[in-house]
Amino acid sequence: MQRIGETFSRCLRALGVLRLSLRQIRISTGLVLFTYVTTHFLNHALANISVAAAESGLLIQKVIWQTLPGAVILYASLTTHMGLGFWPLYERRNFRFTRAEATQLVLGLCIPVLIADHVLGTRVSLSLFGTQKGYAEEFLKFWVRSPTSGVLQAILLLVVWIHGCLGIHFWLRLKPFYPPVKGVLLSLAVLLPALALLGYYQGGEAILLAVDDPVWQALHLMPDHVGTAEQNAALVSYRSWFFVVLAVAFGLTLVARALRRLGEHRRGQR
């Protein structure tokens, strides 16, 4: 019995270490993604000047995030953070969350669904087909060809930002330096997405005015910028498969949780 007790204690300690490690990994990957989103929003804000200014800002983005080290860090963080998003659903003994915790969890689960179209249309399209899409092509897609997708992208912007800000708040709330600067950080947290959304609107309006110009069309409607019909159809297919994978992962998480609860219940009856 003593050996069993010692083994059980070691398992509990190991579980505690695992939970701590997963929390640290979730925070670290979340900070990487929040940094990426912040630079992305700053770039969106440049569209308040002009679409050309936003395109110029992409050069800095590429230096940071499209070099091999930056891309590896970004996509490893994205994959890991998204995978760990299912962990609270499995780990929690019950679904009693605070309102802020529930909001962050629900928003986090919505992000992969909302972001799939954008990631496939930019990074995946570039990697697979070599299409060079910038702000002009993305504004064309979201403001002219698919306004519904454009609305969803604006919603995505807010969902990602609120999810990230809640994560930062949960991480910093017990830090002694946080209360004095919380007001300033809140102001910045409101200002940056507002500027990004305004840039999104201003850039879209500029493209609506330019889209009928033959010179603009010759520059931006080439297949190497917007892709061919076959390439775009393939991206739609990949998006469908991505949604299937997400649904399976979500279902397996709930099944694993149910099996764990069943095992605990049976052990409790012995």
Where in this protein do the model-derived segments appear?
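Membrane-embedded alpha-helical bundles that constitute the cytochrome b-like, heme-associated redox core
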Residues: 1-270
